[in-house]
Amino acid sequence: MSFALGQRWISDTESDLGLGTVVALDARTVTLMFAASEENRVYARSDAPVTRVIFNVGDVVDSQQGWSLQVEQVVEDQGVYTYLGTRVDTEESGVALREIFLSNQIRFNKPQDKLFAGQIDRMDNFVLRYRALTNQYQQHKSPMRGLCGMRAGLIPHQLYIAHEVGRRHAPRVLLADEVGLGKTIEAGMIIHQQVLTGRAERILIVVPETLQHQWLVEMMRRFNLHFSIFDEERCVEAFSEADNPFETQQYVLCSLDFLRKSRQRFEQALEAEWDLLVVDEAHHLEWHPEKPSREYQVIEALAEQTPGVLLLTATPEQLGRESHFARLRLLDADRFYDYEAFVKEEEQYAPVADAVTALFSGEKLSDEAKNKITELLSEQDVEPLFKALESHASEDEIALARQELIDNLMDRHGTGRVLFRNTRAAIKGFPVRNVHLLPLEIPSQYTTSMRVAGMLGGKLTPEARAMKMLYPEEIFQEFEGEESSWWQFDSRVNWLLEKVKAKRSEKILVIASRASTALQLEQALREREGIRATVFHEGMSIIERDKAAAYFAQEEGGAQVLICSEIGSEGRNFQFANQLVMFDLPFNPDLLEQRIGRLDRIGQKRDIDVYVPYLTETSQAILARWFQEGLNAFAETCPTGRAVYDAFAERLIPILAAGGGEELEVIIEESAKLNKTLKSQLEVGRDRLLEMHSNGGEKAQQIAEQIAKTDGDTNLVTFALSLFDAIGLHQEDRGENALVVTPAEHMMVPSYPGLPYEGATITFDRDTALSREDMHFISWEHPMVQGGIDLLMSEGVGTCAVSLLKNKALPVGTILLELVYVVDAQAPKRSGISRFLPVSPIRILMDARGNDLSSQVEFESFNRQLSPVNRHLASKLVSSVQHDVHRLITASETAVEPRVSAIREQAQRDMQQSLNSELERLLALKAVNPNIRDEEIEVLDQQIKELTGYIAQAQYQLDSLRLIVVAHN
């Protein structure tokens, strides 16, 4: 390397310093000043990591004064260059610009500039960049985008609802699946799709206070969506950042109580302009035409201001038609304006539902059913279908006609677009619950303390006394002190120890109401029998709970027993276990259902054993009998439980408080009767049409199968590992489909997106991720992959490379130039552009004569024949063929233009076809189904106009290039 004062060089390792100038030289070192970043660097002359900057005829260079020069001649004097040419702004010719006056800000961003400046990348980085572009393009185009990356089982009805709703603009729907069918996951999938496609950027989730953590965990674990819980303390903290604390975060989670209690916070939340509002447990919003509750008014105001609204409820409408109407009113007040009109309209659907049931079972349609269908659908549409059903056509034709009738009825179904409800009855695949009620003798220690407590408890309300009597171990501790070891004599603990020893190979989940009970049970198992158990309660942080859950999930060396408190277990699922022990009983049937729901969920592969050890002659025994004989709540899901409880609570509570009573038998008998009546009402009122629409039938199966195919994508594994390598992450194989990825010292960036500071355990396998909550499930949609690709692009990794092709059939020194162009439409993300015209790579392979060989020579097989070149040799090769490379770049533009036009045209066709058919369907439906909102049609119309413009304006640019030189050895 020969240096001279005033020469301009660029740093190979710190390209962001800008253009450097040689300011000092001695025998061993050279000093460069980088004026743009105000930095100096001293290098050893013999191997300084810098590259000489020399421009060529035809280049446009910037001066420090801000004007540009088109270079026509380059003159050298004692190692320093002067550029002669024409000024671009004044068109003055013969202007000289000495290199010392070149702009300090010159950056070599264009791939060809970097190539000529000697900033040549590794060959494998060029390959990685091209693969990143092609994979990203395929992901954006996939109709399943937003559904593949979540950590959840592929359950058809959930995927169908998410696919159906997630693609809508500002969806407003009511998700009313029964308990255990995964409404939270459906909502999460919808949110995930809306976020990925840019349709929703600001999201507010409002839930009951006890469910805040569950939602936080589910969104983070399953969808990599990081919400912030907002309470009064958080709002006060955020006040320093913004006047409105809700504007400091994009994704906010808060409790309904918090918004109800503070008018100021409620008004701030209203002003914060959300794109999507999600409300869980929406059945708690009470409404009467004259007097809506404060909670209802809070949500109503938010729903009016927010374009997208998802309401979640587990209560079927048959158990409260008025409150069902109130929920629909929140979604579309113009459509559901009057309760009486709504009831009338609902009544019209009853015969339709009957007709559909008949169609489904393949029975012959009655004349009444036919008339009803003809009233709803026009005669010319249905007549040929009726004929087909009654003719001697083939089974396939009859099935087709039947399906078409059902589809048409579904589209016309009043609430089909706003309401989704799946029931266990309509969805197969649930386990059987084997119930074991185990009456155990009450220890004398408890009898004494409970008798004394009964005498002292005069001031307590019956409800408080009833609650107290359910937990004799707590009463005993009140008298004997916190440290008293009740677990040494409690017969339930003795039974539990025997059961755990007898079921050594099984994982056992134990649920107790209180955190203190759970902790003491763990101590009992450990101290009395040395059994490995772990605890899960509300006093633990999310990370501690994750660790406990992972310890329980581990096949080898894990805990055999997990002991949960009531609140601690909310929202966690342990489908890999099928043994459930209820150490005590909760007061209300919903909580009981929630407990069993930890194991009895869709996706549970085995039947479940539910053990209920209870002490005789206590309130527990009464409650166990009422749950079992009055509600049958242990053996079956009990959607009616709450309604029956509300009807009998006043009579049942005093009996629980007293530990018995004459009226108990009557209450049990009457409860069973009411339960039966309510259940049959539910069955009669089952809306088959709605159920079919909600579970998606065949279509749902296809979606699940399509996603399952992408799950085993080895291409993703290879790509992700190369990506982590290129960025400098440390990887360690942990077996069991797991890898540990940690930040390393020499990373390209200080912190890697989506990767915690301490690193993470990752897996590419969905089943492993489902059983191990401490692992990240890596998919194309995961922030670590998406963020890594963004890093490659923004840091300019792999934009130029040089490779050797060892091929004796070609003369030595033959050159080929591989160029990757990208077509990109500058448009806001929320316009939906990425569905039709994502960043699209075009590969061109020019031979020395300027012919494009890309259609004959496929990228991967060609790449396997190439070998890398060290940087020094690469720079020499580039210098020797610089003129040819310039020529080939110009020639490649002629080759790329027709392909760009073809991409634009195809994108226009796809967009018009997809959105116009959607628009036509909505317009046709609007004529017969008042549930189609005008706003939805207007937005779609506007979207078509905007996208037409954006696609027409799409530009192309050179993203990366590789020079290939033929060698023989």
UniProtKB/Swiss-Prot annotation:
Residues of the Helicase ATP-binding domain: 164-334
Gene3D superfamilies per record: 2.30.30.140, 2.30.30.930, 3.30.360.80, 6.10.140.1500, 6.10.140.2230, P-loop containing nucleotide triphosphate hydrolases, Tandem AAA-ATPase domain
Residue window of motif DEAH box: 280-283
Gene Ontology MF, one: ATP binding
Domain Helicase C-terminal: start-end pairs: 492-646
GO biological process: DNA repair; regulation of DNA-templated transcription
Binding-site positions, ATP: D177, E178, V179, G180, L181, G182, K183, T184
Pfam families linked: Helicase_C, RapA_C, SNF2-rel_dom, Tudor_1_RapA, Tudor_RapA
Keywords carried by this UniProt record: Activator, ATP-binding, DNA-binding, Helicase, Hydrolase, Nucleotide-binding, Transcription, Transcription regulation
Highest rank taxon of the organism: Bacteria
Entry's EC annotation: 3.6.4.-
The protein's role, per its UniProt record: Transcription regulator that activates transcription by stimulating RNA polymerase (RNAP) recycling in case of stress conditions such as supercoiled DNA or high salt concentrations. Probably acts by releasing the RNAP, when it is trapped or immobilized on tightly supercoiled DNA. Does not activate transcription on linear DNA. Probably not involved in DNA repair.
Assembly mode: Interacts with the RNAP. Has a higher affinity for the core RNAP than for the holoenzyme. Its ATPase activity is stimulated by binding to RNAP.
Protein name: RNA polymerase-associated protein RapA
Species: Vibrio cholerae serotype O1 (strain ATCC 39315 / El Tor Inaba N16961)
Underlying gene: rapA
